[in-house]
Amino acid sequence: MGQKTNPIGFRLGVTKNWRSTWYAKKEMPALLKEDALLRKYLKARLDNAAIADVTIERKPGKVVVTVHTGRPGVVIGKKGAEVDKLRDELAQLTGKEVGINVEEIKRPEVEAQLVADNIAAQLSQRISFRRAMKRAVQSAMRMGALGIKVKAGGRLGGAEIARVEGYMEGRVPLHTLRADINYATSTAKTTYGTIGVKVWIFKGEIVEDRRGKTYSTGN
């Protein structure tokens, strides 16, 4: 049932990698909690930096955090001042040495998390949900996505009865494991309650070259 499972979890270990790359035995629950705390803190602290994902790698006595952002200048700051400040804050939070890498997202229009957050932000500002979704779909297709599906659920437009509305363009093959599907969710807080936003973006197929390296045909 490709439509009903999380497309990222469905492809983990096949075409997708884990967001946390480390191994632990007894301390695993504490480290998982620490990972969740780091992500929550970064999301709140860099609210205006278009954060798509945070990957965490652990080495003995050190945590390496990679921030995937559409606006690297906001994260790094003038002469790297912001990133140094952030490194100190995270070191204080974890009690360990922290390294921060910043990776720029070249095409934010085809990054599911940024698209979902953008739609949610527009819904919070009372912009028509149809206009917000259509605009996101058109931008993604224009920037090279092979397919996109967007859904919003809740009291859309302040309606008495909650419902789900969606738009789709191109193809989004959820059953195909080699399909490079980017999936994300976001929540819009409105005066009528919360509205959930889901975005699926099909970027191409993951194929292997003669050297055994994998790449997406959509890049």
UniProtKB/Swiss-Prot annotation:
Part of the 30S ribosomal subunit. Forms a tight complex with proteins S10 and S14. Belongs to the universal ribosomal protein uS3 family. PANTHER family: 30S/40S RIBOSOMAL PROTEIN S3, SMALL RIBOSOMAL SUBUNIT PROTEIN US3C. GO terms for molecular function: mRNA binding; rRNA binding; structural constituent of ribosome. GO terms for cellular component: cytosolic small ribosomal subunit. Coiled coil: none annotated. Pfam families: KH_2, Ribosomal_S3_C. Gene3D superfamilies: 3.30.300.20, Ribosomal protein S3, C-terminal domain. NCBIfam families: rpsC_bact. Keywords: Ribonucleoprotein, Ribosomal protein, RNA-binding, rRNA-binding. The gene is rpsC. One of its GO terms (biological process) is translation. The keyword Plastid does not apply. Residues 38-106 form the KH type-2 domain. InterPro entries: KH_dom (IPR004087), KH_dom-like_a/b (IPR015946), KH_dom_type_2 (IPR004044), KH_sf_prok-type (IPR009019), Ribosomal_S3_C_sf (IPR036419), Ribosomal_uS3_bac-typ (IPR005704), Ribosomal_uS3_C (IPR001351), Ribosomal_uS3_CS (IPR018280). This is Small ribosomal subunit protein uS3. The keyword Ribonucleoprotein applies. Binds the lower part of the 30S subunit head. Binds mRNA in the 70S ribosome, positioning it for translation.
